[in-house]
């Protein structure tokens, strides 16, 4: 089982939200791929390759990825995740991740699961509701789950 983590970065290093998403992805077991998208993102890809649990770093580098537009990145993530290549697609629960994951989920024709705080098993998560006052279990039988993960 493979998991795809979409990296948020500052063109030099991975954001802490992405590091948290990588840690959460390790709960799925299996291999973890990190997708680094941008313009001139060699340093980020090198940093991602040193993170524990990361199996493979996928780098997509082009001028039109330079501004980090969610629509461009979502289309790329959809092409990678379609066809059963990944069990889950994760991003950190930052503004980057919350902007991106609904688009990826829509392109994959699945429902996103936001603000996950615990991964119990593939397809079984915990997330807060009511302004964080209640933690609820969420179960998914979708072919691929698209998640934002709180660190």
What label would you give each PLM region?
Residues 1-151:
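N-terminal glycine-rich FAD/FM-binding segment characteristic of electron-transfer flavoproteins
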